């Protein structure tokens, strides 16, 4: 489940990173808030920097706990975060920008924990293969995320459509939902076997 969860995680992460700049431009135009390209770039840079600490915190939080359960809960929390972020687009530029920061942190929260879960849940003799598969599934998810957002934007009104941005961020959240549901499925399957 950690490998499939990582695919959902990178789908969401790379989709978010691909489209955050144009999203902030849309929001500033929609709410008539004048911001420079430098402000947007610095905001995105700060999101990335703060994301490092979110990932470290998430990995540290899992120590001594049921990692799979915690990561599943993080996925559900991130899915809710995507919904709240999408809703914030209807209210104000500054609220939406704040929610983009929060959502970014929620996306990255489980990053280290997913990789650690892949490493520790298996035998030492197949660790290299598991990590290779982990990376391949992760990059596949990452390759799909950006185009999915673009597809949603193109088919629901374009980059100037409020509805299109709302739906695109809901679609981003599906990465975390798939991750969380993958873990829930494995929990259910494990309980049936015992």
Predicted regions and their residues:
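Intracellular helix-loop hinge segments at the cytoplasmic ends of transmembrane helices
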Residues: 22, 113-121
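Helix-to-loop junctions at the C-terminal end of transmembrane segments
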Residues: 53-67, 153-154
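A late C-terminal transmembrane helix in Major Facilitator Superfamily
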Residues: 122-158
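Extracytoplasmic gate region of multi-pass secondary transporters
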Residues: 1-52, 145-146
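C-terminal transmembrane helical hairpin of 12-TM major facilitator-type secondary transporters
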Residues: 66-114
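Multi-pass alpha-helical transporter architecture, strongest
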Residues: 86-89, 115, 158, 165-194
């Amino acid at each position: 489940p950690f490998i499939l969860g990582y695919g959902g995680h990178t789908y969401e992460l790379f989709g978010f990173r691909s489209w955050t700049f144009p999203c902030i431009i849309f929001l500033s135009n929609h709410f008539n808030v004048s911001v420079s390209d430098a402000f947007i770039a610095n905001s995105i840079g700060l999101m990335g920097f703060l994301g490092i600490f979110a990932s470290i915190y998430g990995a540290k939080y899992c120590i001594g706990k049921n990692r799979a359960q915690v990561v599943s809960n993080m996925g559900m929390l991130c899915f809710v975060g995507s919904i709240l972020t999408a809703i914030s687009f209807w209210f104000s530029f500054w609220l939406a920008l704040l929610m983009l920061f929060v959502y970014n942190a929620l996306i990255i929260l489980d990053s280290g924990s997913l990789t650690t879960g892949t490493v520790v849940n298996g035998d030492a003799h197949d660790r290299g293969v598991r990590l290779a598969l982990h990376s391949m599934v992760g990059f596949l998810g990452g390759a799909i995320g950006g185009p999915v957002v673009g597809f949603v934007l193109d088919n629901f009104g374009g980059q100037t459509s409020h509805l299109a941005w709302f739906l695109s961020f809901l679609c981003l959240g599906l990465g975390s939902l798939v991750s969380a549901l993958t873990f829930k499925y494995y929990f259910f399957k494990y309980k049936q076997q015992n």
